[in-house]
């Protein structure tokens, strides 16, 4: 976003698509045209908000997306598949009618819920959750659109500061939102109308599929015609726990309507800072990580916890990339978009480490360029979260 004086201003994410700095449409389209002009089948194994898949789908390419985040799968699925606005509107009315009876609810199993929502708002969401499950909204395209509208309303109806992609209750939000009731029904109806104007005109030109897949533990992820001719993806950042934090409110509301466990999910995001990070990592693997990231051994001595975050990221990404490489066709192309990171005060060239992991899986680098991120920063800057990525590296590989 550029102001009148020509200076770049941080972009506040929109209400309908605020996935944190994962991919932007102009870069997605550039990558498709540059590397996948003759694409037979395209996979984005970390699809996020689906920008890569949407760009490929517009060209009539069969696209497949994976993501561990149920919210990302829901959002991208609605984007790619489209839905019938009239059918969705009927389902929305059924949802409201069933929930408004007030005699049944599906409680949110989370101790923090009363901190984030007023009692009246919380009661309405728990009634809506019961109605959504009873109506099976997750089983149809129109139902998923209604469910996405429910999820999109959650932040708007919470006590959270609306300026940041990550929910927190600032002093300003506490003062401005205290004692006010934010009605989910009104927000859901408006949001569904906005979704219909964008995605209610039919479905993708070609086959478009989105699956919830944990690539670290995946045994046999879905394939297209024996494999994918092209993979284009922006993997999670090294300190990517924000992908969970940013959507923890929505995930708590969706849990039980969509089959997943939020308590377990927070540990499955690549880049997590939670839990026992190095329990499964052997000494041999740690030594390999020290080779991948110069300075990691020094970081381990000065800040073991930060070093553990790096170890866990490299461990998880190593397994994820191996899984990805195994489902690319022998003549396939793989494009990785990744930036640097700042962890514990240490500057890490994450993309260099991932490029090495790709070469270890039999892929050779044949092209690349840098993409400056001047308009993807999000306010406000908060203590402990100043490691904003200023530039990403695009690296294109073919099988060696």
Residue ranges and their predicted role:
Residues 1-38:
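S-adenosyl-L-methionine
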Residues 125, 130-233, 238-247:
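SAM-dependent nucleic-acid methyltransferase catalytic core
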Residues 237-323:
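SAM-dependent methyltransferase catalytic-core segment centered on the flexible catalytic loop
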Residues 24, 31-100, 187, 193-222, ...:
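Conserved S-adenosyl-L-methionine
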Residues 14-18, 108-120, 306-315, 337-352:
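Acceptor-substrate binding/catalytic loop of class I
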């Amino acid at each position: 976003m550029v102001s009148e004086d020509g200076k770049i201003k941080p972009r506040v994410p929109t209400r309908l698509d605020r996935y944190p700095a994962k991919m932007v449409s102009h870069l997605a389209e550039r990558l498709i045209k540059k590397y996948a002009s003759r694409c037979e089948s395209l996979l984005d194994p970390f699809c996020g908000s689906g920008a890569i898949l949407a760009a490929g789908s517009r060209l009539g390419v069969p696209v497949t997306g994976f993501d561990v985040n149920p919210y990302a799968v829901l959002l991208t699925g609605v984007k790619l598949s489209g839905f019938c606005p009239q059918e969705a509107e009927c389902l929305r009315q059924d949802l409201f009618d069933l929930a408004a009876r007030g005699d049944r609810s599906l409680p949110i199993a989370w101790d923090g819920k009363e901190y984030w929502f007023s009692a009246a708002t919380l009661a309405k969401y728990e009634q809506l959750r019961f109605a959504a499950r009873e109506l099976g909204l997750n089983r149809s395209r129109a139902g998923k659109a209604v469910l996405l509208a429910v999820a999109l309303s959650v932040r708007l109806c919470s006590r959270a500061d609306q300026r940041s992609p990550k929910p927190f209750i600032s002093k300003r939000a506490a003062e401005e939102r205290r004692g006010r009731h934010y009605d989910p029904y009104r927000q859901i109806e408006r949001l569904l109308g906005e979704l219909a104007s964008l995605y209610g005109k039919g479905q993708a030109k070609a086959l478009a599929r989105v699956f919830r897949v944990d690539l670290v533990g995946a045994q046999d992820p879905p394939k297209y015609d024996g494999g994918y001719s092209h993979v284009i993806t922006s993997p999670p950042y090294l300190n990517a726990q924000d992908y969970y934090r940013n959507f923890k409110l929505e995930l708590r509301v969706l849990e039980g309507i969509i089959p997943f466990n939020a308590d377990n999910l927070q540990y499955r995001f690549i880049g997590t800072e939670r839990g026992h990070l190095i329990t499964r990592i052997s000494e041999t693997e740690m030594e390999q990580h020290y080779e991948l990231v110069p300075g990691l051994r020094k970081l381990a001595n000065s800040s073991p916890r930060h070093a553990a975050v790096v170890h866990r990221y490299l461990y998880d990404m190593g397994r994820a990339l191996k899984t990805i490489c195994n489902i690319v066709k022998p003549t396939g192309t793989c494009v990785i978009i990744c930036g640097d990171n700042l962890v514990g005060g240490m500057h890490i060239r994450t993309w260099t480490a991932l490029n090495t992991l790709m070469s270890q899986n039999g892929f050779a680098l044949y092209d690349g360029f840098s993409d400056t991120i001047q308009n993807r920063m999000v306010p406000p800057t908060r203590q402990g979260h100043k490691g904003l990525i200023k530039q990403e590296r695009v690296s294109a590989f073919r099988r060696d």
